[in-house]
Design a protein with these regions (language model features):
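Flexible juxtamembrane loops connecting transmembrane helices in multi-pass membrane enzymes
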Residues: 42, 234-241, 251-285, 305-308
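Transmembrane alpha-helices of multi-pass inner-membrane enzymes
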Residues: 180-181, 354-363, 372-419
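Aromatic-anchored transmembrane helix interface
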Residues: 49, 76-87, 96-120, 134
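Alpha-helical transmembrane segments of multi-pass inner-membrane proteins
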Residues: 126-153, 166-229
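Long extracytoplasmic/lumenal interhelical loops at the membrane interface
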Residues: 35, 268-327
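Loop-to-helix entry and N-terminal half of a specific, functionally important transmembrane alpha helix
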Residues: 21-28, 343-369, 383-388
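N-terminal signal-anchor transmembrane segment
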Residues: 2-64, 84-92, 142-151, 362
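Membrane-interface helix-loop-helix junctions at transmembrane boundaries of multi-pass membrane enzymes
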Residues: 14, 64-78, 185-197, 234-243, ...
Length: 419
């Protein structure tokens, strides 16, 4: 009897270890550290990651298809994403622009969606644990290398050109926000573990060191929420995706389309970023002018042609307007709002409020950078549909990173899950 029990335990442990390794091997190629492409675009390492990502995509596509055949269930999230991607692909074909790049972006989005939706529903504890450990490893590695190479791995003279382990200062924020999301989810499973808090502290420290304008604003917003208002239920009820998206659009219109930034001058002065916003105006004005040439379908790519060179528009909304025009932009807004509104979490108001706060932080970063083709943002969107399932299985305890180790008395007992 004891031998049979021990064999079952060993078999369970082996199965758990194999699942963990497979999930890790699927995730890694989608989050390749950006320094690889920034510093050695044609290196053999980059080629390995491309092949690895393709293999991971076809593997998870097959798994998703097999799971669907076993349990045919209409995946509305997948349908919304596919409709949006079809419109952008049509825009690229219509304009004969960057068709290959569009197909790669589609594969990246669908690949990470299949991974997150499959493991997030079937093995939620393993899913949270592996993602937290993986992103924490990236963050801590980035921190150590920043201490060793304070001017970046490329030893840049200008901070804006500094290349860190996870990428440049102005794009690394997206990975940091996604990591903090998994810190909060991990804390719900292991409330006494200090690792989520320590990782969050490292992220905040790095953000203030890098002095990226959007990164500092996002960090301040998250600190204010976690430290001061996360316990207020009326705030968490007030926080919803539609309201945050509306505020984001107001900022887009005021800052980008009307170029009225005077009311934010004190903030820009404090961040020492007034010149940065002045430079952004050239990108924004050029992007708006190009968008008006083909307003409905866009130009098929997000490039602005300025000073005889190709530049990024440095704004998420203008980026999608250029790529897909009005048609693509409307569907992008519908997709984003549909996915964020899928999060109910009636028994976990604090977790829901925090997720919406992180959603707003992504949008704030989108004022200065693109979001549509960023794997970190698409991964965040892919997490949203599985949160309700986690609540149904009582995986969530309505706890955040700043919570103590004590579980409140009125909280329901949590069922212990196997690894």
């Amino acid at each position: 009897m004891e031998k049979n029990r021990e064999r079952k335990y060993q078999k369970s442990e082996k199965k758990h270890f194999c699942s963990k390794v497979i999930l890790l091997l699927l995730i890694i190629p989608f989050f390749r550290p950006d320094f690889i492409s920034e510093m050695s675009d044609s290196s053999w390492i980059n080629i390995i990651f491309v092949i690895w990502r393709m293999t991971a995509f076809f593997f998870i596509l097959g798994k998703y298809g097999i799971d669907f055949l076993k349990n045919p269930e209409l995946d509305r999230n997948f349908i919304v994403i596919v409709i949006y991607e079809i419109i952008l692909l049509y825009s690229s074909i219509y304009n004969q622009e960057m068709i290959k790049e569009r197909l790669i972006d589609i594969a990246n989005f669908l690949g990470i969606y299949f991974i997150y939706i499959s493991y997030g529903k079937q093995q939620p504890k393993l899913f949270i644990k592996v993602n937290f450990q993986f992103f924490s490893f990236l963050v801590w590695t980035n921190a150590v290398l920043t201490v060793i190479f304070p001017h970046g791995l490329n030893r840049a003279v200008d901070n804006s050109a500094r290349v860190n382990f996870l990428g440049k200062d102005n794009t690394i924020t997206l990975i940091f926000i996604l990591t903090i999301v998994f810190c909060a989810l991990y804390h719900n499973i292991f409330p006494r573990n200090p690792a989520p808090f320590l990782t969050t502290v490292v992220i905040c420290t790095l953000q203030f060191y890098y002095m990226s304008g959007s990164g500092i604003v996002v960090t301040v917003v998250l600190i204010l929420y976690l430290c001061f208002v996360s316990d207020w239920n009326w705030i968490n009820r007030l926080l919803n995706g539609n309201l945050m998206f509306m505020i984001y659009m107001i900022l887009e219109v005021m800052i980008v389309f009307l170029n009225h930034i005077e009311f934010l001058n004190p903030l820009f002065f404090w961040l020492n970023k007034a010149s940065t916003f002045t430079d952004r105006r050239y990108y924004w004005d050029t992007a708006i002018y190009q968008f008006l040439d083909s307003p409905f379908w866009g130009q098929g790519n997000g490039i602005t042609y300025l000073w005889n060179n190709n530049y990024y528009s440095h704004n998420s909304f203008l980026d999608i307007l250029l790529k897909g025009g009005i048609a693509g932009t409307v569907l992008w807004c519908v997709m984003v709002l549909y996915l964020i509104n899928r999060v109910k979490l009636k028994k976990n108001l604090r977790v829901k409020g925090f997720i919406v706060c992180c959603f707003f932080c992504f949008l704030l970063t989108g004022l200065m950078e693109g979001l549509e083709d960023r794997i970190a943002f698409n991964a965040f969107l892919s997490v949203l549909p599985v949160l309700n399932r986690m609540e149904e299985t009582e995986m969530l305890r309505n706890k955040l990173i700043n919570s103590g180790s004590q579980i409140k008395k009125h909280a329901k007992p949590v069922i212990k899950y196997s690894k």
